[in-house]
Amino acid sequence: MGVFNYEIEATSVIPAARLFKAFILDGDNLFPKVAPQAISSVENIEGNGGPGTIKKISFPEGFPFKYVKDRVDEVDHTNFKYSYSVIEGGPVGDTLEKISNEIKIVATPNGGSILKINNKYHTKGDHEVKAEQIKASKEMGETLLRAVESYLLAHSDAYN
């Protein structure tokens, strides 16, 4: 098994605490609402949202795969940090054991925030991660962030 790691950073004008509430704590409800072209539904399979929770994320018709199952590994409300692993569906299967993701939202001096994402692809055998998988993951993250950001800018009273 190999581990391929890559990091993404994206800036937002939304304050860190507010973005954490919307993007992380209520993303299950918000993503299908603000980005239905990316996520059609999120179903809680097991758990209460904390570590060990299993979620099924379904994708719209025409997406490369129908669903993924995520396991929540950590929710740190103080440091605006969230970790989860993709354990089933999507790209996980013959060549990937799992994908571990850590998201940290850091406040910036101007009142906005930086979304820092660290992704670790755990491959099976000597398989390598394809550039298309990384590109698709980056695009999904950017789509969701911008959709949530637009929603929060349009709804100044939400998630305060």
UniProtKB/Swiss-Prot annotation:
The keyword Protease does not apply. Keywords: Allergen, Cytoplasm, Pathogenesis-related protein, Plant defense. GO terms for biological process: abscisic acid-activated signaling pathway; defense response. It is found in: Cytoplasm. Brassinolide binds at residues 55, 82, 84, 101. May be a general steroid carrier protein. This is Major pollen allergen Bet v 1-F/I. It comes from Betula pendula (European white birch). The lineage of its organism: Eukaryota, Viridiplantae, Streptophyta, Embryophyta, Tracheophyta. The gene is BETV1F.
